[in-house]
Design a protein with these regions (language model features):
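Short, small-residue-biased leader/transition segments that mark boundaries at the very start
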Residues: 1-6
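Bacterial N-terminal signal peptides
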Residues: 7-17
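Sec/Tat signal peptide C-region and signal peptidase I cleavage site
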Residues: 18-23
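Sequence-level preference for short, compositionally simple segments enriched
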Residues: 24-322
């Protein structure tokens, strides 16, 4: 048919070897480029996400050039195996300004970026909710499993990162996360390594709602806890639900961390179930003398279980360190 005709002409034109490459590229495009000035494949990130085929078995990279993208970005549940890579963490910015006080919107619809698909990686970009200080305003809302965030910045105030799905596994490496109150919250299992957690107000860093049957909630390893000038009274966490699990291991605490360390959310019952743990932390705020009695100081033996393999349950087919 006519298809063969075109193909034959291509062979004459290209030579045989390149034809195979050409036809393969026609079938799949591995990299989509997003740029504000129209020189890429798309001008906004949502369009690029919508161009990705459902449930792919190969990885597509969406490369986002420097610029400010004012978008409410949704990665739907049928999109998987996608990497969103910015040109630079400082200058590739996804931003929006919804907050919970707009038309009774509620916290859970205020996100700038919502990730419902599995096996999604974000790298070298900023996700921001810039709704000023107007109630809960989520920058990142995750529902997917096996999500990775590498060298990203998360800017917001209250409720910056909502890890919304029980049993979902998330990895944050070398990220900067700032906020005011409960700025990392939810039921998912998440490992944060080499991250900076920056408190903009006297408040609480985490509000985990880990289910009772899940061993690991939030685990922070080798992270740095910093604060804005004048911020002096910050708690490591308070339990959004009973059985909240949060651990800080080999982290550096500024002097803004309160001696008590943890808060019961004005409910003494939470003290019986909360799974709060610390080990090997340094800095002014890491002194354990004043810590609440119901938080655990791990032994050298106990801390050994906090490996990526255990946290992410390697047998369940995902292990980002391979």
């Amino acid at each position: 048919g006519s298809e063969m005709c075109i193909r034959d002409r291509l062979i004459l034109f290209l030579g045989v070897g390149e034809t195979a490459v050409y036809s393969q590229q026609q079938q799949r495009k591995d990299t989509l480029v997003v740029t504000r000035d129209g020189t890429g494949d798309y001008r906004n990130i949502q369009e690029a996400v919508e161009a990705v085929r459902a449930f792919m078995d190969y990885t597509v990279t969406i490369y986002i050039k420097n610029g400010t993208y004012k978008e409410k970005l949704v990665i739907p549940s049928w999109v998987k195996n996608v990497q969103l890579v910015g040109e630079s963490a400082e200058n590739t910015i996804i931003t929006y300004d919804d907050h919970a006080n707009i038309n009774k919107m509620g916290t859970f619809r205020t996100y700038t970026v919502k990730v419902s698909g599995n096996d999604i990686t974000f790298k070298d970009l900023t996700i921001e909710n810039n709704a000023a200080s107007l109630g809960q305003a989520v920058a990142l809302h995750t529902e997917g499993d096996r999500l990775m965030f590498i060298n990203c910045r998360f800017l917001g105030n209250q409720d910056t990162i909502y890890t919304g799905s029980e049993g979902a596994r998330l990895l944050f490496t070398n990220c900067y996360i700032e906020g005011t109150t409960d700025f990392i919250f939810g039921p998912s299992t998440a490992l944060f390594e080499y991250c900076e957690l920056h408190s903009k107000r006297d408040s609480y860093i985490t509000a985990a709602s880990t289910p009772q049957n899940i061993e690991f909630g939030y685990v922070f390893k080798n992270c740095k806890l910093t604060a804005a000038p004048g911020v002096k009274k910050v708690y490591l966490g308070r339990p959004w639900r009973p059985y909240a699990a949060t651990a800080f291991i080999n982290c550096e605490f500024g002097n803004h961390i309160r001696p008590e360390g943890w808060h019961n959310w004005k409910n003494p019952e939470n003290e019986k179930t909360a799974r709060y743990a610390e080990f090997g932390n340094t800095g002014e705020g890491a002194k354990t003398e004043g810590r609440v009695a119901w938080a655990e100081q791990l032994t050298k033996k106990e801390v050994l279980k906090y490996t990526p393999e255990n946290i992410f349950k390697e047998d369940s087919n995902w292990y980002p360190y391979k």
